Structure formats: structure tokens, C-alpha cells
């Protein structure tokens, strides 16, 4: 039997908005430690990893490890029926082929329940190795979102370079080029406005902007974003989910040859 009660129901709504455009169907895995999801996008270029730790829920009951296959578009439609202040409870019985979402208004004068059919989804669990990253950039998530959006109007690939001068985001397209440089800035009134750059080695990697823009759908979840870069490794773009977990997006860098053979 599974029963998870989340007082901040809006968090779950934001989590779904952050992953549903990247992944269509996925297994949510429940264990005693938390509620998690790990899935590749349909083109097998990006990976999303979500964890909501059990202690972040007001009530968390998971008698045995359970994997629930869901269509994220359908799940998002159901969660849109919840008010932003609603308390959301997720329930599933052992062996059942449905999951129930219950929405309670804070005043408890309205309770709605929605039942959704589960799916059988084959998914391989990918071991994500812990890696030492050459450069780690922590910056305001709204700023990162704005940079990705602005650069998308010029080109389709972003080059992220970290040097001792700072972090540079650049692109080139038919209409011209764009470079945006951010320098480390920790003398801010609010810690979430800081730009912190930890550079062990300089890096310069190219990524598809359409994926980066998709990752920025997680911006409402966190005021800061952490970007971890190493040559030869996928970039990790991480947003914290309140105090209870994270969403991490992994994206393989573009290889130089691919850029030379642009379709005519």
C-alpha cells in the first residue's frame, strides 16, 4: 500500500511541468527513502532524474518498493485540477493498476479524487556515476532561463565556457553571434542572487539550446540553478525542489563534427 501526502501540493504541479515536455511516459519509483523518477527523453539525448525524499511529505507510507508507470501528460492534466494551495495525496494499493490523486482544499471544505490507469513501462535503470566536475556554476535560475531564451533567438547551439574570467554563454546563427559573460558575484543582498563559479579546470562545451530551454521549465521550483561541467561528460543542470529533493537534467555535449555537417 502506498500513501503520500504533500501539503505543498503546488510543488508536485511544478515538478510535472518541469518534466512532461521532455518525457512522455515514465515509472515513478517509491521506496522507504522517497519518491523518484529516472527517464530518458524520447530521442535518448537527455536524462532526467527526480528525487522527493520521504521526510518532505507530511505523511509517507510505502510498505514495499513500488514502480508506477504513468503518462506524464495525463498526470499533468489531473494535477492541473488541483488548486495551488491544495494538499495532494497519492494513493495506490498493492497490485492495483490504478493510482488515485486526492486534492483537499486548505479549509477542507472541498475534496476531489481522480483515478488514473497505470501503464506497463519497460525502462532500464541507468547508473549515473558520481563524477568530479571540472567546473561548477551556481547562478539565479531566472538569469539562466533568460540567457537560454535570448540565445535561442540567434542560434541553436550554446557554447558554455568557464575560465578564470567567468562563465561565457555564446551562440552563432544566420543572423549573427551573441556572447554573454557572467563574472563571479557573491557580494549580494540575497544569497540566491549570487553567481558562484568553482573552476578546477577550464571547460568549453557545446549543447543543444532546445534541450537547455526545456530544462529551464524547472525554474519555478528553485531560485538558483547549479550547472556542473566536465569535458567528455554530460552537463548536469540541477534545481533543488524546496528542502526535499532535486530535479537533475543530464545532456551529452555536441561533438564538433556534428556542427560541421549542418543540414543545408
From Swiss-Prot:
One of its GO terms (cellular component) is nucleus. Keywords: DNA replication, DNA-binding, Nucleus. Transmembrane segments: none annotated. Disulfide bonds: none annotated. Its main location: nucleus. Residues 61-80 bind DNA. Gene3D superfamilies: 3.70.10.10. This protein is an auxiliary protein of DNA polymerase delta and is involved in the control of eukaryotic DNA replication by increasing the polymerase's processibility during elongation of the leading strand. May be involved in UV resistance. This is Proliferating cell nuclear antigen 2. It comes from Arabidopsis thaliana (Mouse-ear cress). The gene is PCNA2.
Amino acid at each position: 500500500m502506498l500513501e503520500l501526502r504533500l501539503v505543498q501540493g503546488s510543488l508536485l504541479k511544478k515538478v510535472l511541468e518541469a518534466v512532461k515536455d521532455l518525457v512522455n511516459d515514465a515509472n515513478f519509483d517509491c521506496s522507504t527513502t522517497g519518491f523518484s523518477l529516472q527517464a530518458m527523453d524520447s530521442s535518448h539525448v537527455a536524462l532526467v532524474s527526480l528525487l522527493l525524499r520521504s521526510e518532505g511529505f507530511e505523511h509517507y507510507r510505502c510498505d514495499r518498493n513500488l514502480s508506477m508507470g504513468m503518462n506524464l501528460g495525463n498526470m499533468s492534466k489531473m494535477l492541473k485540477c488541483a488548486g495551488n494551495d491544495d494538499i495532494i495525496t497519492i494513493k495506490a494499493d498493492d497490485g492495483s493498476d490504478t493510482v488515485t490523486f486526492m486534492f483537499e482544499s486548505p479549509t477542507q471544505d472541498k475534496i476531489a479524487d481522480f483515478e488514473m490507469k497505470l501503464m506497463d513501462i519497460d525502462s532500464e535503470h541507468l547508473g549515473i556515476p558520481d563524477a568530479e566536475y571540472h567546473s561548477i556554476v551556481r547562478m539565479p535560475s531566472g538569469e539562466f532561463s533568460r540567457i537560454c531564451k535570448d540565445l535561442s533567438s540567434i542560434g541553436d547551439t550554446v557554447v558554455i565556457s568557464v575560465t578564470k574570467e567567468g562563465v561565457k554563454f555564446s551562440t552563432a546563427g544566420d543572423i549573427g553571434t551573441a556572447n554573454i559573460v557572467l563574472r563571479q558575484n557573491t557580494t549580494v543582498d540575497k544569497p540566491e542572487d549570487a553567481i558562484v563559479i568553482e573552476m578546477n579546470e577550464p571547460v568549453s562545451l557545446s549543447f543543444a539550446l532546445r534541450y537547455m530551454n526545456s530544462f529551464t521549465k524547472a525554474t519555478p521550483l528553485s531560485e538558483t540553478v547549479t550547472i556542473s561541467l566536465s569535458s567528455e561528460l554530460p552537463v548536469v543542470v540541477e534545481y533543488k525542489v524546496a528542502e526535499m529533493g532535486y530535479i537533475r537534467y543530464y545532456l551529452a555535449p555536441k561533438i564538433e563534427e556534428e556542427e560541421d555537417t549542418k543540414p543545408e
